[in-house]
């Protein structure tokens, strides 16, 4: 089976990554990865991303302990977006929710907060 890694299409050095829980298929988050982050994700088995706001590579859960163990990586038909299916430890969202998609466009919170963000990052 061919390895599509070399043919991935990055825009301004980044590729979008959608993250889903491997068991429930709940969408957990959306992030960007650069080539180094994708390579580290593949070699370590844990999700790595590139933060546009901090302009740096980061391993999900490095500070919080809320790691994302990779179960499978899928690439879309245009080879310009990735899907990480993960085993999530703790919360995916830095605001303490299981998913970053915890509210509607109207502002209604539709998921329970699992952790206080102050407790997550006070380690």
From Swiss-Prot:
Zn(2+) binds at residues 77, 93, 100. It is found in: Cytoplasm. Its EC number is 3.5.4.19. Keywords: Amino-acid biosynthesis, Cytoplasm, Histidine biosynthesis, Hydrolase, Magnesium, Metal-binding, Zinc. It comes from the Archaea. InterPro entries: PRA-CH (IPR026660), PRib_AMP_CycHydrolase_dom (IPR002496), PRib_AMP_CycHydrolase_sf (IPR038019). Its cofactor is Mg(2+); Zn(2+). Mg(2+) binds at residues 76, 78, 80. Binds 1 Mg(2+) ion per subunit. One of its GO terms (molecular function) is zinc ion binding. Coiled coil: none annotated. The keyword rRNA-binding does not apply. Pathway: Amino-acid biosynthesis; L-histidine biosynthesis; L-histidine from 5-phospho-alpha-D-ribose 1-diphosphate: step 3/9. One of its GO terms (biological process) is L-histidine biosynthetic process. It catalyses: 1-(5-phospho-beta-D-ribosyl)-5'-AMP + H2O = 1-(5-phospho-beta-D-ribosyl)-5-[(5-phospho-beta-D-ribosylamino)methylideneamino]imidazole-4-carboxamide. GO terms for cellular component: cytoplasm. Belongs to the PRA-CH family. Homodimer. Catalyzes the hydrolysis of the adenine ring of phosphoribosyl-AMP. This is Phosphoribosyl-AMP cyclohydrolase. It comes from Methanocorpusculum labreanum (strain ATCC 43576 / DSM 4855 / Z).
């Amino acid at each position: 089976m061919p390895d599509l890694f070399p043919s991935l299409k990055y825009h301004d050095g980044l590729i979008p990554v959608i993250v889903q829980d491997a068991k429930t298929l709940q969408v957990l988050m959306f992030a960007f990865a650069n080539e180094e982050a994708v390579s580290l994700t593949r070699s370590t088995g844990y999700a790595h991303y590139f933060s546009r706001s901090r302009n740096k590579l980061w391993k999900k859960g490095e500070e919080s302990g809320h790691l994302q163990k990779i179960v499978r990586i899928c690439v879309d038909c245009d080879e310009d977006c990735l899907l990480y299916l993960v085993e999530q430890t703790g919360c995916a969202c830095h605001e303490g929710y299981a998913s970053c998609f915890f509210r509607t466009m109207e502002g209604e919170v539709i998921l329970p907060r699992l952790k206080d963000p102050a407790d997550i990052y006070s380690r």
